[in-house]
C-alpha cells in the first residue's frame, strides 16, 4: 500500500478508551494488543475517542483492522460488531463482520481537510467486538493481512522502521515473573550487565496484583539451605490466593530490581523474535 497521505491510529493508544478494554494476550499471534467491547451483551455506553492529523486535503479511505471472532463456529451474523465515527459522523460500514483472522476491512471514502479530526469506536452489541487499528489513506490499495505485512505497515506509518538498539548486555532475561526476577538479581549481583524484559507494566507474573496467585514451595531446606533468600527479598509478607491487590506488594519487587545498578528494566515490552548466529541467540527483538 502507498503510505503517502496516510495516518494510522492504534486503538489501544486512543486518548480516551471509553468503556472499551485492552486485550493483551495475543500480541505474538496478531501483532499488538487491541480494544475489546466486553459488555456481556449490553452495548458499551462510552465510545473510544481520539484525534488524528490528516496531512493534506483529499478523499480518504477508512480502513479498520478487525476480525469476526465467531466465524470459527458459525457463518451466521456475528455479535461482535461496531461502527467508526469520523468527526462525529458514523461510517456506513459495520465492522467485524467478515474474516475469522485479523484483516483490514474497508469502510467508506471521506472528504477531509488537512488538520485534526476525531475518530471514535462505537460498539453496537456489547459482545466482544475487536478493533486493533484505524487507517485513513488516499491510497485505494488495500494493505496485506499477514502479520509481517501488518508489522511493516505499522513501522512505516508509526515508526521506527528499524529496531532501536537498546544496548548490549551480558545476560538477558525475558519474563519478569518470580523466576525471571530471581535470575536477573542473581546475575546482576555476580557482576553481569543484565536486561530484564517484561511484557506487563508490573513485575511478579502470577504473584503480581494482576493475577494474584500466592507464592508456594519449599525454600531454605536441605540439601540447598541457602536456596530461597532472594524470594525473601522480593516476595510478599503474606501468602494466599485471590486477595486484595496490596497483598502482593508489587512495589516491593520493583524496588529491589530498581536498586540493582547492573539491571536495566524494560517494562511493557513483548519479545517477538530472536536473532541467532548459528545455534547461539545473539539478540532479542521486542515491541513496546
How would you name each of these model-derived features?
Residues 1-163:
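Extracytoplasmic
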Residues 180:
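N-terminal Rossmann-fold NAD(P) dinucleotide-binding loop
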Residues 192-193, 198-280:
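Conserved N-terminal/central alpha/beta ligand/cofactor-binding core
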